[in-house]
């Protein structure tokens, strides 16, 4: 069952343009809380991928992070690379330049 929180997360993620990433922390803070892990939980059950591009959400240090295991992490990396994002050693290259921050 989808919660109001899930819907709010999905609506925010749809705002992240191709070629950019955001973080679990950015999403949580934009929603007015610090529930970073709850954001990850919502994205793990995203029924609208890739329309809701959860592959564009990464860790706050620029690491690509989990995506349901190694095979799925490789899929996430491939999707990001297809959008022009360079990844080196599991991290977004030029992370600060690629980081999408939601307006307040």
Short names for language-model regions:
Residues 1-104:
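Nucleic acid-binding interface residues in structured DNA/RNA-binding domains
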């Amino acid at each position: 069952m989808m919660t109001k929180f899930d819907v709010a997360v999905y609506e925010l993620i749809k705002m992240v343009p191709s070629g950019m990433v955001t973080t679990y922390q950015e999403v949580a803070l934009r929603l007015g809380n610090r529930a970073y892990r709850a954001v990850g939980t919502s994205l793990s059950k995203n029924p609208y991928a890739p329309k809701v591009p959860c592959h564009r959400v990464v860790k706050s240090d620029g690491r690509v992070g989990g995506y349901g295991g190694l095979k799925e992490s490789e899929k996430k990396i491939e999707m990001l690379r297809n959008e022009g994002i360079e990844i080196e050693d599991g991290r977004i290259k030029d992370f600060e330049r690629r980081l999408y921050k939601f307006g307040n």
